[in-house]
Design a protein with these regions (language model features):
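Periplasmic c-type cytochrome electron-transfer domains
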Residues: 1-170
């Protein structure tokens, strides 16, 4: 829609390339940075960064349609910039020596006991790149849409740098 879809609390791009988290947005409705072309045109009311002919070829005008990569130098530059964001700041959960603080060790115990790794697992503490949407009981009809249909769940975000990315869904 012209107003966007789904939940609108923006997920941080900090360290995103380093995590390889995959699709963008809580609703996982973009599979490449270049998909923002549609929002530039509809939501922002702009003319876009690629020609109308290229944008309207095949399914390219749909978020998960034909790839837009290589069709606009500006969109590719934006994607390259996002891809350069591969550094995470030092964690407040670690001491200057790199060891987990006592509070972080207690948090690790809760994480293990509650089975958090079933969604927030692996090196990125996420669910694998946006292909698995999860509903942790916070999704309702008013949460928005995903690709024109009711939002079935969210793309489980990384827990890296979680102290800086509130609010949380559970």
């Amino acid at each position: 829609t012209a107003q966007g879809e789904g939940l609108r609390n923006t997920i941080s791009l900090r360290g995103r390339a380093g995590l390889g988290q995959g699709r963008l947005h809580w609703s996982s409705n973009f599979d490449e940075v270049q998909d923002f072309e549609g929002q530039i045109r509809a939501l922002a009311g702009g003319t876009g960064l690629m020609s109308d002919a290229l944008f309207n070829t095949g399914t390219r005008n749909q978020p998960l349609g034909t790839s837009k990569a290589g069709q606009s130098a500006e969109l590719d530059a934006l994607a390259a910039y996002v891809g350069s964001l591969n550094q995470m700041p030092l964690s407040a959960a670690r001491s200057s020596s790199g060891a987990l603080t006592a509070a972080a060790q207690a948090g690790r115990a809760v994480f293990a006991a509650q089975g958090c790794a079933s969604c927030h697992g692996g090196a990125s503490f996420a669910n694998g790149g946006g292909t698995l949407l999860a509903d942790v009981g916070t999704i309702k009809a008013s949460s928005g849409k995903r690709l024109g249909a009711l939002l079935p769940g969210i793309d489980v975000p990384t827990l890296r740098d979680v102290a800086l990315t509130s609010p949380y869904l559970h």
